[in-house]
Every structure is written in C-alpha cells, then in structure tokens.
Amino acid sequence: MTLFSSISSLSSSMTSSRSIFASFGSGTIMGSNSISCTVGSGSCGSGSGGCGDLTGGAKSSGGSCGGKGGSHNHGHGHGPHGQGGKGSGGSCSC
C-alpha cells in the first residue's frame, strides 16, 4: 500500500511539471517541462529569477520568452536546456 501511494504521488508530480503553459497574447504555446511566461503586463515567469529553469525544462537567456519591441518582432530564446518560448511583441526579458 505504501509503495502504491509513493508511485501515485510521483506520477502526479511528474504530470503537473510537464503541463505548464506558456501563453503569449492571442496565441498559446505548450511545451513539455517549459516554464510559463506571459507577455503583456511585463511580468515574466514565476518564482525568483523570472523564467529560470525551475522544472528542468526549457531555459532561455538573452531576451528570453520571445521578442522585445514592436508587434512585428518575433523573438526566439534558446537556452542550454532546449528552446524557450516564442513571443510576438511585448516585453519579457528574463
């Protein structure tokens, strides 16, 4: 019984860490083990460090979480743990 509850707990924690959404204005991007990052209000990610590598997923650096500037700017952040979010305008630099 103890083993089952441990497996169940581990399974549910893995599932929750893989289903984090990253939404950008009108479009929504979902990536496994990616940090959520919302563009619009200037806030970026969650926890200290903004879009840090909290779940072992994507980690971006240098204008991460998409582009900075006008509506025609589409930025891609690439980090050591995979590809970061994709943004269209707004300011979301972590």
Swiss-Prot record:
GO terms for biological process: sorocarp development. Residues 58-94 are annotated as: Disordered. Disulfide bonds: none annotated. Residues 58-70, 80-94 have a biased composition (Gly residues). Signal peptide: none annotated. It comes from the Eukaryota. InterPro entries: HssA/B-related. Belongs to the hssA/B family. This is HssA/B-like protein 53. It comes from Dictyostelium discoideum (Social amoeba).
